[in-house]
Amino acid sequence: MLAVAQHLSSAGHDITILTAGVFREKVIAAGLDFVSLTGIANYDYRHLEEFFPDKRNLRGMDLIIYYFKHTFGDTIPDQDRCIRQIMAKRPVDLILVDVPYLGAFPLLLGSKNDRPPIVGCGVVPLLMRSADFGRRFSQPDTTPEGLLRNKEANCRFEASFQPATDHINAVLARCGAPPMPRPVFDCMCVLPDLFLQCTGEAFEFPRSDMPDTIRFVGPVLPKPSVSFDEPAWWSDLDSGRAVVLVTQGTIANFNFDELIQPTLMALADDDMLVIAATGRPATELMVVPPNARVESFIPFDRLLPEVDVLVTNGGYGTVNQALSLGVPIVVAGETEDKALISARVAWTGAGISLGTQDPTQEQIGTAVRAVLADSRYRDRAQAIQQNFKEYSAPDSITRAVESLIK
């Protein structure tokens, strides 16, 4: 969202970012106005268990329901209040919301005459249901039998998710808003006046029931790094060996034993260069084999063009950036939106999904070697790369926003 805001600012728009206080320095460093969320909406995503301690032992559907009840649902009143306070202090021509920001629902469920246009920004896979595939991890199937299975799967999901739906509707009622007209995942995408999905169509399940208000704008890629001090080992990239990059991103990176450490060990005896981007200082003791290099930060726009395989827990931005360069992927992830991303990697053929957040060394090693040995994975990744070249996210987002500003 920060990258989107910077694009709009460079196009001449005055931007105010409303987000948690933990992002204050990043927003100000980007030259944008910052307003902090307040109350329980102002939590630190890096320490969710401190703010939402009951999530600690939950997994699977129970964890998803908990997130939507409490992380997203209970924060609606404070998020809504903050938006309205900004609107009361200054003219607001348009509101751009991240997809899980349910605090815009009270405005979206009210009269259009009482609010500016609201645009949703899809920085995770498209969440709304479709007749063409079942909820969560199933892939498209439009055969008669498949359509029936899809319907049954969607019904089962909505039934199991009903406690979260009821909870969110109760919170909305306290805000003076009517209940959601559709399931919450649908409402995220169809309630806004326009919804911009930040990837290309080649990296999303096709659907025959796509609303007209949803547009693909291509991936929002980081700005090219201006300066970068190459680490001492940088010339190793020219050794002729396969280059493997492993990362756990910047959120689910508290435990390197989930992916980074087992990847280093799985490939320790292979004739390849394995680079771990930790996303934070690696304060704990790590075992670093001779063929591995570890850095807390490396600009991916510099490194990914040299990479043969990306091993990741499936962050949307990282995966889209890799595919924009035609890099095939081995993905392991269950937290946040990452299981949905894994399903799309597998469906496109641009990589291998390990189907778990905690893969074994054997699983990782086998998958990496398979991707390196079979050119079809890189071919599919490069096909997505060609699709991405048809888009210019900054231009598309700017045009979409300006079309709604009166």
Q: Model-flagged regions — what are they?
A:
Residues 23-25, 102-106, 319:
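Short, well-ordered alpha-helical microsegments
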